[in-house]
Amino acid sequence: MYTNEDEKRLHAQAKALLTTPADGLEQIETLRDIINYADWKYYVQDEPVFADEEYDKLFKQLKHLEDKYPEHITADSPTRRVAMGLSEKFPAVSHLVPMLSLDNTYNAEDLRDWDKRCKDYAGTDNIEYCVEPKYDGASISLIYENGKLTRAATRGDGIMGEEITINAKMIRTLPLSAHFDKEGITQVEIRGEVVIHKKVFAEYNEQRAAQGLAPLANPRNAASGTLRILDPQEVRRRKLSAIVYHISDYTLTGEKPKSLNSHYGSLEWLYNLGFPTPVKEMKVFKTIDEVIQFCDEFETKRDDLPFEVDGLVVKVNSFEMQEKMGMTSHHPRWAVAYKFKARQATSKLLRVEFQVGRTGSITPVAKIEPVPIGGVTVTSISLFNEDVVREKDLHIGDTVLVERAGDVIPYIVKPLAELRTGQEKKI
């Protein structure tokens, strides 16, 4: 779909726009091209080419220009949809309700701006907010009919996903049946996140290292990749977990239960039905200042959680108010993600040094241009063994994607081979 020259051009344009943000009409199309390319690499090729924060900055630039020049908004703009493309491994199915993205915030000022917009949309200053962890995994949609789990699907492009029902049934934390009938519900669609416990992930990487395989970069990639394995028993062996965080649709035979009047109430109800929900970590607040204080405090505790989180999600608690506020084609107006400091960045591979251990084992160590990630400046990264170097196809001079998650040591996720100029040297 994209030639090497296309990829180099798009990366160069993205780098320029990240340095000097766009402000002119002529840059709208460039931003659309960059974001469409990034989406294709992420959702279709499973190869993210930008750090999350870089992508969000580019997306916000496009949104800013389209707000400034609304007459130039096109139906195929990335802001009009969620993502693109599907794998052909699993059958495609339609979500009952589109799985939209979340708008992102990064600081107190962003949250206060969102609070003002919420009050404008809701027509009142009296808004209760629910705050919960934003788990860093793979999103799924679950359908229960007459109390039985009948379908599970990946997020896909937000409209269509890949059916992974058999694999989802291998996740021990997901009930195969639940008593929705007690509230007169015959069909329900639930949203959740598939994750891997930090200890399970560390053990799995130890097993891979013992087999001479490269460690997986992060739990998110491990969860996403595992869901799409064709062998359900292998899925079972990898010990995935799931956390559900939203009821997107339901069919009632009687009156609506009180538990479905609020977001917090609905997750508390699901928890009592046997579903893993974030009720123990969730908090409800009456002011945005309380929300901001909680966000600041929670970020310092993120590494204490058993699963990786990359932020918090703030939602209007009242379902009635959510319905009144509505949504855009990209995200609900009643929810926003508060993103923690980035733990992923790009750098340049300067050289590889070989260190000899006490037992005589030789470990290759990558030396990179200093880059701050998660509050730490990273300059050296272990490559574990020669097999990892070969598997990742690293070259001196490569631009590399580096990640540091929780207390895990930094990884080189991969080289950005599309940026090679021909001057790089194979290790």
Residue ranges and their predicted role:
Residues 1-427:
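RNA/tRNA-interacting regions in translation and RNA-turnover enzymes
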